[in-house]
Amino acid sequence: MAWTRRSSTPSPEGARIAERGSLSELGEFGLIARLTAGARVGPGVEVGVGDDAAVLTPTPGRKLVVTTDVLVEGRHFSAGLSAPADWGWKAVVVNCSDVAAMGALPRWLVLALTVPADTPVEVLDQVYAGIGEASRAFAVDLVGGDVSDGPALSLAVTALGEAERVVTRGGARPGDHLAVSGPLGAAAAGLALLR
């Protein structure tokens, strides 16, 4: 799997700016409806975005693998150095990567989004375009989450996956094959260069 985003060019989905409204004008439910329109919904999703909680049906006989990562503006991404679609892409793939590292197939995502009140809606359109692009690329479904206002933009993604056999960090045995998808330490080195 390639965990890097193919392009920093805004996708047509993220370019949808039908109306220019503020977050306060849209309200929480209006924002959720706007951002999740056209979201992928695959097998196993009984109830997804729009209700109090998601209802999922895992594949019988598989183990459920769960992880969460939080990306915070100024720490994990910067508005001046990368496109908002890249932030959404990264939020999905770092979680899918953790699930895959455990020998599981990523299936579902839940997103908790904190947004400063003065954030242009267009920025969130782009963030969700990146989330949508990554979700389709890795066949995972965004099934729920929460939106709140706060001092800095942050994306907390919880990914759920399924595995027949779980692979843990301490579970490697002589003769096992170890694989990496890119240069070790490259992400940290890149961030250090940008700072």
Residue ranges and their predicted role:
Residues 2-195:
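Helix-biased detector of long, well-ordered alpha-helical tracts
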